[in-house]
Amino acid sequence: MAGRLRGPAVPGGGESSDSDEDGWDIGYTERPDKLKDSLLSEEKDEVLKRALTTGDGSLLEELLNSGMQVDSSFRFGWTPLMYAASIANVDLVRILLDRGANASFSKDQHTVLMAACSARVPEERILKTAELLLSRNASPNATCRKRMSPLMYAAREGHSQLVALLVGHGAEINAQDDNGYTALAWAARHGHKTTVLKLLELGADKTLQTQDGKTPAEIAKRNKHPELFSMLSLTLNPLHGKFQNITKEENICKFLITDSEKSRDHGFSSYSAFGDLEIFLHGLQLEHLTELLKERDITLRQLLTLRKDDFTKIGITNVRDQKKIMDAVEELQVEEIKFEELPEVMKLEFSGDEFLNFLLKLSKQCGHLTTAVQDIISQFPVHSHKIVLEWGSPECFTSVCEDLVHNAQNLGEEVGKLKHLIQKLHNDQKNDSCRIPPMENVSTGKKRLWKRAAVTVCGFGLLFIVCKLTFLRK
């Protein structure tokens, strides 16, 4: 029986008779040869947990045959179906559903389908479980207390085929939770490239913002996923709505059957992974160039540095394809500071706006440089066997890195000096008795004097009229 244990040890299992809590033991306990009708309710609960833990379908059926209610709940509210779904045991789920278990059951708005979508098991098992639950009318649009849907749980875990299955059964792809996160935002936050691509293919809106005003691209950047940031920042929405007009059956078939056939030779993953180059080309609807670029061993970084003449040399002759790539590269390029446009000498007429603009550009450039280094770090080969071409001596690279660190420190020191000078200038201006006040202050003082004079004149005029009327009456 020990050989029938499946998956990680999560809710379900044997409990000692001395336990006051409704806890779960993970160890193996011997199964009785035959269940007795006289078993107490507590004993049946213990045997039921054992059946769920070990994945023992025959023991579960014996319990149900002995009179145990299929939707009986444990002390903390979960039903057997909820436990079976949480470990994505499709055999147990099928037995319980066939016996009348409620596929739409929820505890504190957490549904059975949500439990399956967040299971810590291989995606293939989750797919089978979710498909079975959906066939028994489990709602793909139910939300938990935080308004998260099963689709958001699937996207958060990076299950791309599960995402396709849920959307194929009517899940709202652009629904938002309490924080304004969509399924796309959740996938971007956790760096799931394949899931992001799948959601974009299915029509996810990458312009929707969270409650704090962040788009999926900005979320990816904040969580240090530069490739996703680049892809989501493109003007075009990659393959937007490409599969929105096909039927539910065609949708499910398209994203489940074909992908599973491709991955038969790969034991653990049921979906194929996409590299940076593939994602970039998908984003521009240029998938047909993938094989061409791979044959010529052109990486994404090399592609981003090509010029118009280079495209023709490598076989990209279509003008529209060339323009798409160049427009995308132009959009992703770092804005360079044109130092030659700055005044050579600091003159008195050098405006504060120009100086502020220089500082803002300098700060932006430093931010871009930091992002570029983070990008290199995230893709740097950790193991030497992953390096295809022979590299030079590491001392050469470390020496340049030391120069970079030294230059960065010098930049920090110089900026600190500049800040000190600005503060000193500000203090000198405040303490200078001969300083001419700004025109705004002068004009404001004159306006006040004119207002006072006008009020005084009006007051004297009103007093004169009152006195004259009083004199005439007498």
Swiss-Prot record:
InterPro entries: Ankyrin_rpt (IPR002110), Ankyrin_rpt-contain_sf (IPR036770), Asz1_SAM (IPR042650), SAM (IPR001660), SAM/pointed_sf (IPR013761)
PROSITE patterns on file: ANK_REP_REGION, ANK_REPEAT, SAM_DOMAIN
Pfam families for the chain: Ank, Ank_2, SAM_2
Residue ranges of every copy of the SAM domain listed in the record: 270-333
Single GO cellular component term: pi-body
Keyword Translocase: no
Major localization listed first in the record, in broad terms: cytoplasm
Stretches that traverse the bilayer: none
Subunit structure: Interacts with DDX4, PIWIL1, RANBP9 and TDRD1.
Its biological purpose: Plays a central role during spermatogenesis by repressing transposable elements and preventing their mobilization, which is essential for the germline integrity. Acts via the piRNA metabolic process, which mediates the repression of transposable elements during meiosis by forming complexes composed of piRNAs and Piwi proteins and governs the methylation and subsequent repression of transposons. Its association with pi-bodies suggests a participation in the primary piRNAs metabolic process.
Name used for this protein in its record: Ankyrin repeat, SAM and basic leucine zipper domain-containing protein 1
